[in-house]
A protein has these predicted regions:
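A generic secondary-structure micro-motif detector
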Residues: 119-120, 803
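Conserved, single-site charged/polar hotspot
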Residues: 2-81, 104, 166, 172-178, ...
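Short, solvent-exposed alpha-helical surface patches in non-cytosolic proteins
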Residues: 67, 71-107, 121-136, 143-168, ...
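Residue-level detector of short coil/turn "hinge" positions at structural boundaries
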Residues: 140-141, 824
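Surface-exposed aromatic
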Residues: 114-118
Length: 841
């Protein structure tokens, strides 16, 4: 860490005392006061005087009943280089550290920018942290300035620590003489670490980690790396506000959160030992390794090492020495991995080393994560050392020939099964710990006590299918193609069905679309389902369950409706065909029923990375009317949308559906109950998308649990397709802006809350009724507010259309297009413009 200011070290003594064991000086700021109540300015001579960790006198106070250890200790070991003992802490870096003590990275980045300081550039690394510190009352500026480069004083440092953890034992004795002196970086880091250690004990700051890493590259030795980015032996990190170029090829000890290095604690003077490095080349006394995402070349005079090997070595004065090449490696089918161990088909469970590395080979070696090891694949070579898996090399891309499906219970709510009962329509065999038993058709195999199951249970049909008697599905007791595997975990059973990829679709297609829609419609569903499953396969989102996907709507509904000849034919006729855009398979979104128009995906969902809304719209997921030649005007205009949605006679591909138009009434009490029951959970899930009106008239993202009694509800913004993007809800206690269709549909659920009361009814286009529905059917609706003489809302009439998010393919719309004579290719082009249906295998 390099600081340009000249620093004068002062021998000012600060005693760190436990909370409750010694009182602060009378002139110290009370712990409850925010840091902004005290500000610092440079000494008149133009320099801030630094209180250094070197000058701290520690005092041992009577121990608290919590068993807190002695105050901050100064590490005097010669093997460690203390960082920043004579350097100050900037306000910018203090803001970053304070904010990340209390927030994960996503939460910080999801906050809208509210600061207006003249000296804070929106593009600066510290801007988002200063913004969060301001919003959360941790730090602020004065006179329109934040002074990010100024130093933090002793009093400011203590106030920040008090905000991070008001119950912390970390207290400095503050006097008139030292309160406005700059605190050294080293001292601050030690106090900060102690403070967050106590927080972690309360499970408040559990996302913070202490790591030891070797720095391999930053932009000082790799111009391709943006400033603030580094590559360490454990992978890429960001380290904004810290200069780590001086520590390349050294081991450092840091505090980090979500891949952001918060603080540099110290550097080790001993020669670093590299582990699990991939050998990228060896020639002419030079050894080239690839590690963490960086390629480095070092002097080497040892024996020949084969490219693609994995090794440990010590870096001594720029030379690779004491090289240990891993000799034990194997390939095996991966059944499950959870970050702590991997279970294999033949070798069973093996633990991962603390420094587990993952690489992939191809045109170039790449740094990967454990999630890139696809469940069910056997394309990875694993390297072991001392009984643990130290590294993995993905030698080729896994092929989705089979797919592993985690089976949920009857309710589709959990993966845990209390009891398992299996039979078969034909003979089947069961293998446990290498012992195989054959069962006849109709025989039952029952598991009731997870404690008695120590190994994976394999169940394979010899003929016919396996029937799971212990759960129910839409068509009754489900029968499965492929094999079943059962393990005991956390007092319950997990069940996985391994089945051919195409055979999996045999049961997905009829579960997602009625077979009565016809052959052409089922072919369209088969292609979209295959495209979606393809991306789910490589997303590897269910690896901890030993699966690629699950059988519920979280992935795609599987085997809830029995496969038919029609669904099988649709899958076979389109075998291997997926939708692609610019050569990549797309995740082909689909939904149940449109209101006569689709929505732009960027006007429905926030950006996955930044959480900004609206987001960019994909060129193949755009708003489009559901009838050729129709023009309903600009549906983002409230009057046009109201006229459109109240018209039950619109000529649309979807208009035969009972969900094409719907109507529901909710009283003030029902709306108030629904909003207040769901508001806290939705804010915590997406804080940037729910904003509360502040006293200055500005809506800001702030924690909110209730609006009080509903006063008004109104549409603020609609998308091109007429879908509501932002809703304003005014209550007696709070007024909020709610964005994105899912938040809106969740807050105003048409269902009763609490004891008693009548069921809330949705009236469908065909006269049918649905009661206590889980969500508002769609965000394509308009409202009529019915008020009393005083203007207070008594109830609200919702006129709506469609069912689902409205992005991509409308399944009922497919049926309508088929009936209109449209072909398979025309339907796909209509719903996913610019894509191509291409064979992937």
């Amino acid at each position: 860490m390099k600081i340009k200011k000249h620093i004068i070290l002062m021998g000012i003594i600060c005693a760190c005392l436990f909370a409750g064991c010694a009182a602060l000086d009378k002139k110290e700021t009370p712990p409850q006061q925010a840091a902004q109540n005290e500000s610092s300015s440079p000494d008149k001579e133009g320099e801030n005087l630094v209180v250094s960790a070197e000058n701290i006198k520690t005092e041992t106070a009577p121990a608290k009943t919590t068993g807190v250890e002695s105050p901050v200790q100064i590490n005097a070991e010669s093997s460690l280089e203390t960082i920043g003992d004579n350097e100050p802490l900037s306000r910018a870096l203090a803001a970053k550290m304070a904010v990340l003590a209390l927030n994960d990275r996503y939460s910080v980045e999801s906050l809208e920018r509210e600061i207006t300081y003249a000296d804070c550039d929106e593009g600066a690394w510290y801007d988002k942290y200063v913004n969060a510190a301001f919003i959360q009352g941790i730090m602020t500026g004065e006179g329109g300035l934040f002074r990010p480069d100024d130093n933090i004083t002793i009093i400011e440092a203590q106030n920040i620590l008090n905000i991070i953890n008001s119950e912390s034992s970390v207290k400095m004795r503050i006097t008139d003489e030292n309160r406005d002196k700059s605190i050294s970086y080293a001292l601050w880091v030690q106090l900060y670490e102690k403070c967050i250690d106590e927080l972690e004990g309360e499970n408040i700051s559990g996302g913070i980690n202490k790591k030891s890493m070797i720095v391999l590259a930053d932009n000082s030795n790799n111009s391709k790396l943006p400033e603030g980015n580094i590559i360490a032996d454990s992978g890429p990190f960001t380290a904004f506000g810290l200069k780590l170029g001086d520590y390349v090829d050294r081991r450092i000890n840091v505090i980090e959160r979500d891949g952001e290095i918060i603080a540099l604690k110290n550097a080790e003077n001993a020669a670093p030992r590299f582990s699990g490095a991939y050998i990228a080349g060896w020639e002419d006394g030079k050894l080239t390794i690839f590690l963490g995402g960086a390629e480095r070349t070092y002097e080497y005079t040892g024996d020949t090492i084969e490219k693609g090997s994995i090794c440990d070595f010590t870096l001594q004065n720029g030379k690779a020495e004491s090289v240990n090449v891993y000799k034990d490696s194997f390939k095996d089918t991966v059944k499950l991995h959870n970050g702590e161990h991997i279970e294999f088909a033949d070798r069973g469970v093996l633990p991962l080393s603390e420094d587990f590395r993952v690489y992939s080979e191809g045109s170039a070696v790449m740094w990967r994560r454990s999630r890139n090891i696809i469940i069910g694949s056997d394309t990875v070579r694993f390297f072991t050392s001392e009984g643990k898996i130290s590294a993995a090399v993905i030698e080729s891309v896994a092929k989705p020939e089979k797919i592993r499906v985690a089976i949920k219970d009857t309710s589709f709510e959990k993966f845990d099964h209390e009891r398992v009962e299996i039979t078969g329509t034909g003979q089947f065999k069961i293998r446990i710990e290498g012992m195989e038993t054959t069962y006849e058709a109709g025989d039952r195999y029952v598991l009731e006590n997870p404690e008695h199951v120590k190994d994976r249970v394999y169940i394979e049909p010899i003929s016919g299918r396996l029937v799971m008697e212990s759960i129910k599905r839409g068509y009754g007791v489900p029968a499965y193609r492929g094999s079943l595997e059962i393990i005991a975990k956390d007092g319950a059973f997990l069940i996985v069905n391994e089945v051919g990829f195409e055979e999996y679709l045999y049961s997905v297609v009829p579960s997602e679309m009625p077979v009565s829609y016809g052959a052409e419609a089922l072919k369209v569903q088969a292609v979209t389902a295959r495209s979606y499953a393809y991306n789910q396969f490589f997303a590897n989102g269910f690896s901890e369950y030993g699966a690629n996907v699950c059988d519920s709507v979280i992935s795609q509904v599987y085997n809830n409706v029995n496969e038919t000849e029609s669904s099988i034919k649709a899958v076979n006729d389109t075998e291997g065909i997926c939708l692609t855009y610019d050569g990549s398979v797309i995740s082909a979104n689909f939904f149940s029923t449109s209101a006569g128009i689709m929505a732009n995906n960027g006007e429905v969902w926030a950006d996955n990375s930044t959480r900004k809304f609206p987001a960019n719209t994909s060129p193949y997921l755009v708003s489009k009317i559901q009838q050729e030649g129709s023009d309903y005007g600009n549906l983002s205009i409230e009057e046009n949308m109201a006229a459109f949605i109240k018209n039950n006679n619109i000529k649309s591909y979807d208009n035969f559906s009972n969900w094409f138009r719907w109507y529901v009434e909710m009283t003030n009490e029902e709306l108030t109950a629904s909003i207040n029951a769901n508001l806290k959970e939705r804010y915590e899930a997406s804080p940037r998308l729910i904003k509360t009106l502040q006293s200055d008239g500005v809506f800001r993202s702030r924690p909110v649990e209730s609006i009080g009694r509903l006063i008004n509800i109104e549409v603020i913004k609609r998308g091109e397709g007429g879908n509501i993007m932002t809703l304003k809800i005014t209550g007696e206690e709070n007024t909020i802006l709610v964005s994105t269709e899912y938040n809106i549909r969740t807050l105003i659920r048409p269902r009763r809350y609490g004891e008693g009361g009548k069921a809330i009814e949705i009236k469908l286009a065909d006269g049918g009724i649905r009661t206590d529905y889980g969500l508002m059917p769609s965000a394509f609706f308009t409202m009529e507010r019915m008020t009393d003489a005083s203007g207070e809302i008594q109830y609200v009439k919702f006129y709506g259309g469609g069912n689902g998010h409205g992005v991509g393919m409308s399944q009922t719309g497919v049926k309508g297009m088929v009936d209109a004579g449209k072909t398979f290719d025309e339907i796909l082009e209509h719903f996913y413009p610019g894509t191509a249906a291409e064979k992937q295998w």
